[in-house]
UniProtKB/Swiss-Prot annotation:
The lineage of its organism: Bacteria, Pseudomonadati, Pseudomonadota, Gammaproteobacteria, Enterobacterales. It comes from Escherichia coli O157:H7. Gene3D superfamilies: DD-peptidase/beta-lactamase superfamily. Keywords: Acetylation, Hydrolase. This is Glutaminase 1. The gene is glsA1. Belongs to the glutaminase family. The modification N6-acetyllysine is found at K294. SUPFAM superfamilies: beta-lactamase/transpeptidase-like.
Length: 310
């Protein structure tokens, strides 16, 4: 049994130490994100047996953004299986910024990773659906199953993103021209933009991590969401590419599968044990929450979790 007092103390200490850390700035290329109060901060644990510990602004709802890629990858694995995902998308880090097209040019249009924009747009196109609305509803449903039924689209975030997503539209057409997109290019881009525009809070984000930690069973609803055999593929991708250009540094220092989003959220998974999540809007130059990284790393260190330890 995990010690409840120790878990709450770890969360409290991480929040106290890092919630007012200076550095970073909000994502400014999406108007909605630029206007989120920069002083917000939260950290939470949800264990694989369903216990919740949190500190700070843990009820504040923020844009899921790139963390949504984890959910869509999970659904693609359920729909088409791990071999098809590897063949059609790839399973390798790009070593490039999350919105780069260089990897597409270097690898014949294949996107390489489902956790960067090109691969995520292609992954969205893999979801079994007869039309854009069905594709979107299935992706929203998997987000809700993994994290909580209150996860929902923000029209304000979506509008803010749809009016500025020219780069992603270009990526979608590049994928389409190379034969690595499996539905209409603008449909894929539209649904991808919507999946990034849902709102979540820090406890729900930790619940997403706890569902992965529990082998695909949501510990709060006790419902199986994913096949257990698919979870290791998700965690492997998170370890390799979850924090963009900081992924190697994260693996070296923290040693947990992680995923960040430019909305300020960050998630880590301790397989079999818990999900750890944090939120704070100011980002480093790679697009990862400055305070969030520190808070999650602090919790993991205090509790002694690192997948590379014996």
């Amino acid at each position: 049994m995990l010690d409840a007092n120790k878990l709450q103390q770890a969360v409290d200490q991480a929040y106290t130490q890092f919630h007012s850390l200076n550095g970073g700035q909000n994502a400014d290329y999406i108007p909605f994100l630029a206007n989120v109060p920069g002083q917000l901060a939260a950290v939470a644990i949800v264990t694989s047996d369903g216990n919740v510990y949190s500190a700070g602004d843990s009820d504040y709802r923020f844009a899921l953004e790139s963390i949504s890629k984890v959910c869509t990858l999970a659904l693609a694995l359920e729909d088409v299986g791990p071999q098809a995902v590897q063949d059609k998308i790839g399973a390798d880090p790009t070593g490039l910024p999350f919105n780069s097209v260089i990897a597409l040019e270097l690898h014949g249009g294949k996107p390489l990773s489902p956790l960067v924009n090109a691969g995520a747009i292609a992954t969205t196109s893999l979801i079994n659906a007869e039309n854009a609305e069905q594709r979107w509803q299935r992706i929203l449903h998997i987000q809700q199953q993994l994290a909580g039924e209150l996860v929902a689209l923000s029209d304000e975030v979506n509008q803010s993103e749809q009016t500025t997503n020219f780069h992603n539209r270009a990526i979608a057409w590049l994928l389409y021209s190379a034969g690595y997109l499996y539905c209409d290019a603008m449909e894929a881009c539209d649904v991808y933009t919507r999946q990034c525009s849902t709102l979540i809070n820090t406890v729900e984000l930790a619940t997403l991590g706890a569902t992965l930690a529990a082998g695909g069973v949501n510990p709060l609803t006790h419902k199986r969401v994913l096949q257990a055999d698919n979870v290791p593929y998700i965690l492997a991708e998170m370890m390799m590419e979850g924090l963009y250009g900081r992924s190697g540094d994260w693996a070296y220092r923290v040693g947990l599968p992680g995923k960040s989003g430019v909305g300020g959220g960050i998630l880590a998974v301790v397989p079999g044990v818990m999900g750890i999540a944090a939120f704070s809007p100011p980002l480093d130059e790679e697009g990862n929450s400055v305070r969030g990284q520190k808070m999650v790393a602090s919790v993991a260190k205090q509790l002694g979790y690192n997948v590379f330890k014996g």
